[in-house]
Amino acid sequence: MKIVKISPRGYCYGVVDAMVIARNAALDTSLPRPIYILGMIVHNKHVTDAFEEDGIITLDGPSRLDILDKIDSGTVIFTAHGVSPEVKQRAKEKGLTTIDATCPDVTKTHDLIEAKKAEGYHVIYIGKKNHPEPEGAVGIAPDIVHLIERADDLKTLEIPTDKILVTNQTTMSQWDVQHLMEDIQKKFPTAEFHKEICLATQVRQEAVAKQADVADLTIVVGDPKSNNSNRLAQVSQEIAGTKAYRVADVSEINLEWLQGVENVAVTAGASTPTPITKEVIAFLEQYDPMNPATWERVRKVPLQKILPRVKVKKEQ
């Protein structure tokens, strides 16, 4: 079996930065305890489990405000997906120490929404409902930001001005966003468009589109909650024309997928730890359908190998 290692794949700078911020927080003895992450720091359970070992507690819930209600003291880390001004204000009112790990690409979108609100615009925001990134973006200006996920949402959308900005969640499929923007243009011809697919997401999607077409199967390594991982599987199927499955790690690979397969493409979401992806590749490289000794699929990567290394500051 030939393995096509799609490149680039895996961690983006925003994810690594967020994890380094959280690791440094865990090592900072001056920060009030306990230390919480408001939702998953990045959408990968292996990462959140590793942070639990570091003493950082991940809390999840239907919204960031709901999660904040569970916290009475300590330090709160805002995730890479960003939060609304209301969340920041609520944390301040509760007397919590806050650390912001928002991805710079997300912050750029928030700043754009604020600037356009000041100019009297309404904003159509393309994103996934119940995902934390759109929650934070809509929360920047909930009175003028309209979240849509698919073309059907446009049917009932009415906006009381011709001053309209269209932007999007950074981890969406660039092809889905383009198609939706074309539909929006037809209904709102005066709209201005700012496509905000982050560069890391874009190049990973384009790599799958161009490199997975030679494979019989694509395996995307990523968490089920990771939107960018799910979009990579979608791109493989819809753009490259190659059947795709998403797995959290090697243990989720179904041997039936590999029957009759000669070429397997492997990629990974931007929040997927590199050792987890390497373990998947190593399994596929040694797999022999005629040798049961090669069929074992057990994640063996220790949690301490998941998180990026940080330098411990020496006391003066």
Swiss-Prot record:
[4Fe-4S] cluster binds at C12, C103, C198. It catalyses: isopentenyl diphosphate + 2 oxidized [2Fe-2S]-[ferredoxin] + H2O = (2E)-4-hydroxy-3-methylbut-2-enyl diphosphate + 2 reduced [2Fe-2S]-[ferredoxin] + 2 H(+); dimethylallyl diphosphate + 2 oxidized [2Fe-2S]-[ferredoxin] + H2O = (2E)-4-hydroxy-3-methylbut-2-enyl diphosphate + 2 reduced [2Fe-2S]-[ferredoxin] + 2 H(+). Binds 1 [4Fe-4S] cluster per subunit. The active site is at E133 (proton donor). Pfam families: LYTB. Its EC number is 1.17.7.4. GO terms for molecular function: 4 iron, 4 sulfur cluster binding; 4-hydroxy-3-methylbut-2-enyl diphosphate reductase activity; metal ion binding. Dimethylallyl diphosphate binds at H43, H81, H131, S226, N228, S271. Keywords: 4Fe-4S, Iron, Iron-sulfur, Isoprene biosynthesis, Metal-binding, Oxidoreductase. (2E)-4-hydroxy-3-methylbut-2-enyl diphosphate binds at H43, H81, H131, T170, S226, N228, S271. Its cofactor is [4Fe-4S] cluster. GO terms for biological process: dimethylallyl diphosphate biosynthetic process; isopentenyl diphosphate biosynthetic process, methylerythritol 4-phosphate pathway; terpenoid biosynthetic process. Pathway: Isoprenoid biosynthesis; dimethylallyl diphosphate biosynthesis; dimethylallyl diphosphate from (2E)-4-hydroxy-3-methylbutenyl diphosphate: step 1/1; Isoprenoid biosynthesis; isopentenyl diphosphate biosynthesis via DXP pathway; isopentenyl diphosphate from 1-deoxy-D-xylulose 5-phosphate: step 6/6. It is an enzyme of class 1 (oxidoreductase). Isopentenyl diphosphate binds at H43, H81, H131, S226, N228, S271. Catalyzes the conversion of 1-hydroxy-2-methyl-2-(E)-butenyl 4-diphosphate (HMBPP) into a mixture of isopentenyl diphosphate (IPP) and dimethylallyl diphosphate (DMAPP). Acts in the terminal step of the DOXP/MEP pathway for isoprenoid precursor biosynthesis. PANTHER family: 4-HYDROXY-3-METHYLBUT-2-ENYL DIPHOSPHATE REDUCTASE. Belongs to the IspH family. This is 4-hydroxy-3-methylbut-2-enyl diphosphate reductase. The gene is ispH.
